[in-house]
Amino acid sequence: MGNPRLSLEWEDEAYVLSARSHGETGAIVELLTEARGKVAAHVAGAASRRMKPFLQPGARVIVRYRAKVEGQLGSATLEPMGEGPSSLFDDRLALAGLSAAAAVAAAALPEREAHPGAFHALEALIRVLEIPEIWPAVYVRYEAGLLQELGFGLDLSKCAATGAFDDLVYVSPRTGRAVSREAGKPYHDKLLPLPPFMLSSQGGLAEGDVKAGLDITGHFLEQFVFGPLNRPLPPARLWLLDRLAEADKL
């Protein structure tokens, strides 16, 4: 069938990242697929009551896409898969997490470039959004995964200064590499605190851990992804931090 990214007609599963009105009844919808990456398409009838529920960020859909010319905006029809984010409608905090995840992916990922790791990271986050005790930490790992997928992965395997593997408690804001307690002590005020959950999935979360993790991923998203594009972090990402603070989840 050839390269799926170059095909002018295809069918695939996708997550909705965003939808904005276009014309009287249509919308331009950004979708994240596993094989084709982020794809935008015009969806007719998107304003209808039937379609609105599965045009929300994080909804999983079957996409049937067609384009006349490679590189130009194509059209698509969408069919829902499962309940989608409607199951979270009573959980405003989880919805804020889902909206932030979709907004960051929509703003960070390039068009028509396969990033299967980003697709699976979003999938993993959505699966745990109904578990309030753990999803904020998974969200941090999601953003770290996006950085990795885009070529800006954090190196938390050992101390950048000494090569030590133990007692890693900082991250260099310049390089994204871990720093041990001993090596980082003289530069404590200039380093980013590294929460233990970013090193291991074992153990619980302490107060301040999620905030520290979001500070790390937010810093490097700004430095490596959005800064070069002269863009700030998406508003939905900033709102998530506010909502988590209000819920005492940081």
Curated annotation (Swiss-Prot):
Family note: Belongs to the RecO family.
NCBIfam families with a match to the protein in the record: reco
Record-level GO cellular component terms: bacterial nucleoid
Keywords annotated in UniProt: DNA damage, DNA recombination, DNA repair
SUPFAM superfamilies: ArfGap/RecO-like zinc finger (SSF57863), Nucleic acid-binding proteins (SSF50249)
Domain of life: Bacteria
Stated role: Involved in DNA repair and RecF pathway recombination.
Biological process, per Gene Ontology: DNA recombination; double-strand break repair
HAMAP family in the record: RecO
Protein name according to UniProt: DNA repair protein RecO
